[in-house]
Amino acid sequence: MVVTVRSLGLQGIAGYEVSVECALSGGLPAFDVVGLPDAAVKESRERVRAAVRACGCKFPVSRITVNLAPAALRKEGTVYDLPILLGLLAAQGDVDPPAPGAAFLGELSLTGALRPVTGTLPMAMAAARLGVKELYVPAENACLLYTSPSPRDTER
């Protein structure tokens, strides 16, 4: 089963949509992240693995492939931890797949707690432009977004 979770990335100061596709398949157990990830994105495998266990779920003993699309754009930072976790849990049937109108950003600690990420304001503005109806971010980032002007206010 392939589960797609919406997220966002930054290219310079402009936000763009990233589709986080999570697939479980047979074969030797592995956890691969593809789609031009940087070192921090590749390290998300260990944070996600620990968070799955911390939330009381079993980590799948199968081949896990996470594709970050569009593959031609470099993905940087820890912003994809949360969408990878949600995609993995949905792919193995532990949670329902997220609604298509929702997007997710957030770094995971080894306990599964969310940590703030950088660049949420331009990503939130891109989310509004892309028609995202619900944007889920760590609490520390939500405070910043709540006190910032609406993307509609900045377009005038």
Per-region residue spans from a language model:
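N-terminal low-complexity segments that are often proline-rich with Ser/Thr-Pro
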Residues: T154-R156
